């Protein structure tokens, strides 16, 4: 541009010297100079505009970011406030005056129903019941998401009759007992190994080889398992994770007379044609010779010995032994394990006064429980089930059916009745009750019946079967204490 200006100056000087010859050229170049000035001014203005546009965009971005942060913070504060209001309602509900409750109902209960449903669905049975008393809306939602508590019936199995195997049910809540029914699907040598989810794991007690099968006494469906030629059932404790109709079902067996150097474990899944056998190092040789029942909880199988807790992980195929503080031993150990909401409990009925313990996982100790906080535990040789929600005389009790306990129990009832009769122990009164409470006998038998607690389907009622009338029973003339 400087060169162009010099050229124009030269032309102007030439014009002065030669005014007639260069007028047109000078005018032409003057126009070019004006155009260049206009372009320069436009360029300068455009640069400023672009700069301002960029600044404006930056301001817009900052404003949008501030707005989003404000919205996020508001929503977070609202969520925190909702949770605080919910906690206040739950904590103060039982002891709040009607006036204060009314104020809370107006201001604090305005929570989205989806949020209330989500929260109540994750509460325990006890907290769900408590939450349902807040207001009618909450009561309806709590009832819709409430997990039904387990029901337990006693299945009694008699193989000593000439007519063959018979069985029946006893509902301790309704205090009703069914009449006995024939069971041609089973042989007299059938034994019950384990009960869970309404199914029984059974075997032929006369066979040294573990001939096992699943049996559903409600549908009479039977599922045979392949022969287990390694584990003799008489020396092995068995359990299963869930109903065999589910793909996740796993049968677990552990040999309780394993050698001093190894623990033998067998597993089987529905659809498999053979068992899987594995040996694991026995880190505590003398501890796993007297095992109680096997507990399946949260994907793991647990076995309790005198001073340790054995844990088998079927996914990782690992066996671990966790030392725990020992519980005083009796000459004859009678123990069960069960679980409720992730907590593991142990019932020790080795003495005449049963004790209940809960596992403290952090400190590896069994903590003694004086009560069950409203729960109840049903115990038999093939099952141990913990329930919640029972009331009255069925709350905070241990309900036993065990041939070992029945044999040692002092009673005024005739021998055949005492050996074939369940009884409950109250943790409130620390005493046992032998009142039959509806458990009557159709006939007198000198053989010992087999009994196991079983969880019936929720769609089935004890009244779906023929109920034994007390007037037809043979033991109503005896006095039970």
Swiss-Prot record:
The protein's matches in CDD domains, at most eight in alphabetical order, are given as:
F-box_SF (cd09917)
Cleavable signal peptide = none
The F-box domain, residue ranges: 105-156
A Pfam family name for this chain? Beta-prop_KIB1-4
Q: What is this protein called?
A: F-box protein At1g49360
Q: Which organism is it from?
A: Arabidopsis thaliana
């Amino acid at each position: 541009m400087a060169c162009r200006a010099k050229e124009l100056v030269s032309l102007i000087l030439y014009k002065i010297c030669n005014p007639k010859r260069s007028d047109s050229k000078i005018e032409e170049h003057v126009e070019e100079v004006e155009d260049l000035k206009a372009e320069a001014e436009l360029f300068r203005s455009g640069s400023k505009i672009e700069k301002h546009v960029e600044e404006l965009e930056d301001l817009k971005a900052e404003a949008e970011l501030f707005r989003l942060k404000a919205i996020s913070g508001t929503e977070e504060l609202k969520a925190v406030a909702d949770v605080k209001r919910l906690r206040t309602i739950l904590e103060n509900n039982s002891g709040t005056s009607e006036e204060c409750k009314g104020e809370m109902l107006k201001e604090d209960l305005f929570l989205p129903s989806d949020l209330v449903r989500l929260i109540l669905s994750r509460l325990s049975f006890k907290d769900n019941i408590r939450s349902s008393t807040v207001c009618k809306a909450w009561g309806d939602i709590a009832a819709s998401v409430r997990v039904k508590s387990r029901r337990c019936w006693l299945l009694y199995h008699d193989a000593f009759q000439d007519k063959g195997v018979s069985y029946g049910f006893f509902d301790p809540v309704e205090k009703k007992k069914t009449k006995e029914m024939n069971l041609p699907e089973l042989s007299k040598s059938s034994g019950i190994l384990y009960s869970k989810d309404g199914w029984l794991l059974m075997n032929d007690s006369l066979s040294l080889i573990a001939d096992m099968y699943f049996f559903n006494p409600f549908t009479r469906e039977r599922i045979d398992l392949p022969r287990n030629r390694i584990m003799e059932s008489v020396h092995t404790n068995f359990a299963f994770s869930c109903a065999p109709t589910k793909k996740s079902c796993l049968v677990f067996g552990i040999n309780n007379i394993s050698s001093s150097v190894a623990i033998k474990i067998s597993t089987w899944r529905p659809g498999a044609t053979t068992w899987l056998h594995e040996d694991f190092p026995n880190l505590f040789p003398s501890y796993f010779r007297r095992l109680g029942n096997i507990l399946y909880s949260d994907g793991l199988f647990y076995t309790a010995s005198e001073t340790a807790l054995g844990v088998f992980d079927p996914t990782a195929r690992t066996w671990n032994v966790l030392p725990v503080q020992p519980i005083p031993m009796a000459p004859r150990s009678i123990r069960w394990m069960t679980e409720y909401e992730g907590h593991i409990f142990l019932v020790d009925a080795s003495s005449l006064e049963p004790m209940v313990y809960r596992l403290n996982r952090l400190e590896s100790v069994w903590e003694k429980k004086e009560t069950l906080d409203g729960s109840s535990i049903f115990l038999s040789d093939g099952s141990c089930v913990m329930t919640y929600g029972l009331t009255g005389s069925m709350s905070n009790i241990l309900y036993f059916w065990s041939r070992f306990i029945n044999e040692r129990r002092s009673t005024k009832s005739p021998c055949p009745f005492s050996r074939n009769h369940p009884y409950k122990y109250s943790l409130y009164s620390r005493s046992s009750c032998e009142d039959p409470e509806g458990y009557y006998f159709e006939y007198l038998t000198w053989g010992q019946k087999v009994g196991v607690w079983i969880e019936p389907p929720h769609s089935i009622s004890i009244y779906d079967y023929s109920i034994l009338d007390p007037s037809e029973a043979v033991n109503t003339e005896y006095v039970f204490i």
